[in-house]
């Protein structure tokens, strides 16, 4: 890891980025105190280092302020990293760690050591004995980072727990009992809800057993697993705190009364949805994206043949089932938004698994709400899961607002600084790179259709591949990664494909992606949590070349992919390819203008690069709409909780379906 250890070399860049000179002066003073301890600690043996760490814990638990313990704690953490991992925290990482301790979100570029930086505030907050959590986007990254940093923490006498989806209650309790716990936002949220449900059940039972002399739970396995929410460091903070903010985490309660009728109606709607035509039978609201049947559409529903079970369903409900099914047929596509695979519970039964657009990974255990998931199951002919009510619910946004101490790290937060500060009260600071970036942006290319765009991409891959430089091509969906892979096969270009269907090979593919002559086609899986290292001879011939095949709903996601090249000051280049049938145009300008652009594209031969600005304008429109949605969510959740508390309800358990 090549980093500068001279703080003065980075001071100007940092101060300019944050524009907070007084705060920066104070951080530099703390850095100087950390540096002053380095030679002393290097002269001490491992046992003395551990004793120092134990003494710090006693002082913290006795009430001494963590800000006063910070210099020694960070110096100890740096020395433990040097000895156990051969990785020394450089000065900019120490500064980043100070910012994290003070509740900031730090923007650190790929390869600049976010995982190592995270150990600093995690260790410091763990000293008070209330637990420190690190939340990341998936189980793989949680396990990888925890195991990677574990020798450092063990040298300091600090225990580490890892939460994985398959863990049982006992395993989770043990992991939360550790000083530091790595896991995902989803698992932290579900454990919070399960504990809350359990506490309610215990309170009711204890009330019923009052006077019996038997506590009822002391020897039971039914015990809460979390021990509170003190500090959370959010990795990939923009993805979790912004992109996933509206995602509700729901524990369902099974309804048996009308199961057969509901399942039969889903099948009936899926069978008949393709018969309905846009404008004639249904309309789509450009703002809300809501599907609504026209008078002719409702008339068609009434005329459709129905089984006895479906016939007993209310007419308004039938309309909603058809509208929902039309939406899933048009907008939810196999190998884009979801995949079909054998169920983990029963390999003989297929199931629908969501593909997370922001990470490109399978969203294990997550289901779409409002009947969308069941409608897709009916469309694909797989077993329809039992519709559920809500036993408990919390949004990702609300989950992290419960932590009294919150901080985050990401490679792309500056563009969302205002939103993060407004919702989470977490200012954003940009940590400077240790070497000047050498990433080159090549002019964007615009084509009429997806086909002509992909043919041009394949040609560019062929040209770059001939030079020996590694190439990474990012796609928005699984089906497009497969399509591009076929084009490369036709050209005889050996390559790897990384998407949610072969996640088990992720580590192997990523490890080789920076090698000479390597070509990798990947979904967003390659955009977050991956650090593609170049082989020794690649830097001399220009480094990695990244191709973005279309714009995402947020510019931050595009920047994540671009950040795979030019890591740690290495050379690299990237280019964006766009076409007039890209989804971002539909999201930004609406269905009517999108169809006009699409027809224009079909009549266009060659490239129309002058239209590139139109795509970025559409992206900004989508970003603004999503921002408004998140603001509305925050206000709605705040008002709902306030009202429920006023009438004596639990805002997380007494939730409307």
From Swiss-Prot:
Signal peptide: none
Substrates-to-products reaction catalysed: ATP + H2O + cellular proteinSide 1 = ADP + phosphate + cellular proteinSide 2
Residue positions binding ATP: 93, 111-115, 531
Pfam families listed in its UniProt record: P-loop_SecA, SecA_DEAD, SecA_PP_bind
CDD domains: DEXDc_SecA, SF2_C_secA
Family annotation (SUPFAM superfamilies): P-loop containing nucleoside triphosphate hydrolases, Pre-protein crosslinking domain of SecA
Main EC class the enzyme belongs to: translocase
EC number(s) per entry: 7.4.2.8
GO biological process, one term: protein targeting
Source species, domain of life: Bacteria
Entry's localization field: Cell inner membrane; Cytoplasm
Gene3D superfamilies: P-loop containing nucleotide triphosphate hydrolases, SecA, preprotein cross-linking domain
Topology with respect to the bilayer: Peripheral membrane protein
Swiss-Prot/TrEMBL keywords: ATP-binding, Cell inner membrane, Cell membrane, Cytoplasm, Membrane, Nucleotide-binding, Protein transport, Translocase, Translocation, Transport
Principal subcellular localisation of the protein: membrane
Function as written in the Swiss-Prot or TrEMBL entry: Part of the Sec protein translocase complex. Interacts with the SecYEG preprotein conducting channel. Has a central role in coupling the hydrolysis of ATP to the transfer of proteins into and across the cell membrane, serving as an ATP-driven molecular motor driving the stepwise translocation of polypeptide chains across the membrane.
Protein name as it appears in the record: Protein translocase subunit SecA 2
Species per Swiss-Prot/TrEMBL record: Rhodopirellula baltica (strain DSM 10527 / NCIMB 13988 / SH1)
Gene it is expressed from: secA2
């Amino acid at each position: 890891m090549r980093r500068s250890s001279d703080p003065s070399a980075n001071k100007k860049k940092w101060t300019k980025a944050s524009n907070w000179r007084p705060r920066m002066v104070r951080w530099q003073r703390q850095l100087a105190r950390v540096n002053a301890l380095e030679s002393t600690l290097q002269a001490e043996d491992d046992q003395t280092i551990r004793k120092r760490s134990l003494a710090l814990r006693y002082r913290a638990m006795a009430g001494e302020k963590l800000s006063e313990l910070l210099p020694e704690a960070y110096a100890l953490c740096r020395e433990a990293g040097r000895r156990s991992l051969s990785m020394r925290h450089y000065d900019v990482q120490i500064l980043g760690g100070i910012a994290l301790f003070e509740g900031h979100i730090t923007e650190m570029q790929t390869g600049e050591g976010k995982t190592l930086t995270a150990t600093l505030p995690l260790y410091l907050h763990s000293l008070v004995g209330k637990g420190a959590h690190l939340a990341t986007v998936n189980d793989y990254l949680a396990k990888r980072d925890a195991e990677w940093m574990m020798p450092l923490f063990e040298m300091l006498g600090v225990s580490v727990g890892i939460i994985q989806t398959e863990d049982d209650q006992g395993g989770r309790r043990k992991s939360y009992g550790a000083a530091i716990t790595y896991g995902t936002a989803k698992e932290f949220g579900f454990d919070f809800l399960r504990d809350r449900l359990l506490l309610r059940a215990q309170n009711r039972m204890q009330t019923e057993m009052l006077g019996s002399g038997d506590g009822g739970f002391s020897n039971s396995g039914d015990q809460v697993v979390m021990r509170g929410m003190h500090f959370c460091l959010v990795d990939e903070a923009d993805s979790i705190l912004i992109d996933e903010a509206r995602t509700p985490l729901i524990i369902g309660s099974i309804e048996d009364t009308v199961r057969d009728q509901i399942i039969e109606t889903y099948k009936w709607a899926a069978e008949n949805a393709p018969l309905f035509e846009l404008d004639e039978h249904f309309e789509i609201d450009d703002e809300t994206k809501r599907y609504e049947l026209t008078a002719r559409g409702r008339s068609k529903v009434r005329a459709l043949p129905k089984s006895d079970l479906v016939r007993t369903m209310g007419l308004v409900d039938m309309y909603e089932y058809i509208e929902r099914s039309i939406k899933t047929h048009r907008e939810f596509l196999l190998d884009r938004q979801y995949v079909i695979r054998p169920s983990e519970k029963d390999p003989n039964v297929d199931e629908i698994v969501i593909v997370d657009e922001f990470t490109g990974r399978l969203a294990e255990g997550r289901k779409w709400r409002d009947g969308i998931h069941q409608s897709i199951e009916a469309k694909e002919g797989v077993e329809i899961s039992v519709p559920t009510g809500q036993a408990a619910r919390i949004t990702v946004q609300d989950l992290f607002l419960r932590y009294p101490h919150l901080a985050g790290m990401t490679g792309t937060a500056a563009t969302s600084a205002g939103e993060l500060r407004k919702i989470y009260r977490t200012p954003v600071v940009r940590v400077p790179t240790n070497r000047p970036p050498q990433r080159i942006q090549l002019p964007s290319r615009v084509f009429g259709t997806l086909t002509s765009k992909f043919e041009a991409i394949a040609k560019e891959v062929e040209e770059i591949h001939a030079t020996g430089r590694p190439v990474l091509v990012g796609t928005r969906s699984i089906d497009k990664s497969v399509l591009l892979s076929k084009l490369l096969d036709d050209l005889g270009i050996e390559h790897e494909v990384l998407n949610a269907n072969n996640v088990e090979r992720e580590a192997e593919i990523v490890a080789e992606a920076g090698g000479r002559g390597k070509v990798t086609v990947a979904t967003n899986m390659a955009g977050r949590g991956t650090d593609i290292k170049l082989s020794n001879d690649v830097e001399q011939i220009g480094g990695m070349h990244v191709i973005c095949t279309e714009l995402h709903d947020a510019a931050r996601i595009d920047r994540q992919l671009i950040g795979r090249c030019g890591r740690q000051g290495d050379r690299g280049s990237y280019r964006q390819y766009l076409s007039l049938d890209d989804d971002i145009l539909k999201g930004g300008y609406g269905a009517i203008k999108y169809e006009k652009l699409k027809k224009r594209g079909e009549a266009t031969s060659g490239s129309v690069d002058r239209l590139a600005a139109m795509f970025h304008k559409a992206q900004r429109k989508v970003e603004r709409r999503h921002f408004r949605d998140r603001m509305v969510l925050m206000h709605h959740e705040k008002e709902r909780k306030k009202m429920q508390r006023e009438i004596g309800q639990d805002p997380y358990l007494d939730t409307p379906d």
